[in-house]
Curated annotation (Swiss-Prot):
UniProt-annotated catalytic positions: 103
Annotated EC: 5.3.1.6
Name of the protein this chain belongs to: Ribose-5-phosphate isomerase A
CDD domains membership: RPI_A (cd01398)
The protein's assembly and partners: Homodimer.
Record-level GO cellular component terms: cytosol
This protein's UniProt keywords: Isomerase
Listed GO MF terms: ribose-5-phosphate isomerase activity
Encoding gene, per UniProt annotation: rpiA
Keyword Transcription in record: no
Length: 220
C-alpha cells in the first residue's frame, strides 16, 4: 500500500464519526483532501462544513458541500484534520500547509478532534518536523531571536503568506519533551499569532493508515 493509499484509507475511515445533520469542521492537507472526497458522498446528509483554509473551502465548494463561516456556527461535533507529527499522547505538530492558526481555532470549537494520518507521521518525540510559527510580519526578526533563545533554529518560509496575511517561521532542531509548556512559551512571545504545537488541544481520536489497514487510537 502506497503512502497516498494509507492517507486515503485514514481519510475515508473518519466518515463514521460524522453525524447526520451536523456541521463538520474540516482541516487542510493531502490526507484531509481524501476526507473531503469521502464527505462529498454524504453531502445531502449533513448541513455543511466549516473550513480551516481557503484551499479546503474551494475543494468543498467544488464538490457541492456548503461551507459556513465559523462565526455563524454554535456547535461543531467533530473536527477532522491531519498532522505533520503526532506522539502517543496525541500531541501534534501541524502547520506544514501554513493554516495552523485557523486549524487551531476550529479545533478549539469542536467537541471531538479526529486526527487522520499515515503511519509515517507517528513519532515518540516531537520536533524532527520543523515547528511552524505564524508571526506578524513586522515582528519576524524579533520573534526569530526569541526562538533561538528557546534552543531552536528558525528559518523564514520564503514566499508564503498565510490566509491571515502573516508569515511563517519554521523552527528546526527542537527536541520537544514538554509540548504543552513549549506551546505556551512560544505563544507568549510578542508578535507570535500561534505556533503549530497542538498539545493543549490535542486529538481525541487518531486514525492511522497502515499497510495492514486503519488503526484507531483514542485518548484514555
Amino acid at each position: 500500500m502506497t503512502q497516498d493509499e494509507m492517507k486515503k484509507a485514514a481519510g475515508w475511515a473518519a466518515l463514521k464519526y460524522v453525524e447526520e445533520g451536523s456541521i463538520v469542521g474540516v482541516g487542510t492537507g493531502s490526507t484531509v483532501n481524501h476526507f473531503i472526497d469521502a464527505l462529498a458522498t454524504m453531502k445531502d446528509d449533513i448541513e455543511g462544513a466549516v473550513s480551516s483554509s481557503e484551499a479546503s473551502t474551494q475543494k468543498m465548494k467544488a464538490l457541492g458541500i456548503p461551507v459556513y463561516d465559523l462565526n455563524s456556527v454554535d456547535r461543531l461535533s467533530v473536527y477532522v484534520d491531519g498532522a505533520d507529527e503526532i506522539n502517543d499522547r496525541m500531541d501534534m505538530i501541524k502547520g506544514g500547509g501554513a493554516a495552523l492558526t485557523r486549524e487551531k481555532i476550529v479545533a478549539a470549537v469542536a467537541e471531538k478532534f479526529i486526527c487522520i494520518v499515515d503511519n509515517t507521521k507517528q513519532v515518540n518525540i516531537l520536533g524532527e518536523f520543523p515547528l511552524p510559527v505564524e508571526v506578524i510580519p513586522m515582528a519576524r526578526s524579533y520573534v526569530a531571536r526569541q526562538l533561538v533563545k528557546l534552543g531552536g533554529d528558525p528559518v523564514y518560509r520564503q514566499g508564503v503568506v498565510t490566509d491571515n496575511g502573516n508569515v511563517i517561521l519554521d523552527v528546526y532542531n527542537l527536541k520537544i519533551l514538554n509540548p504543552k509548556e513549549l506551546e505556551s512559551q512560544i505563544n507568549e512571545i510578542v508578535g507570535v499569532v500561534t505556533n503549530g504545537l497542538f498539545a493543549k488541544r490535542g486529538a481525541d481520536v487518531l486514525l492511522v493508515g497502515t499497510p495492514d489497514g486503519v488503526k484507531t487510537f483514542t485518548t484514555k
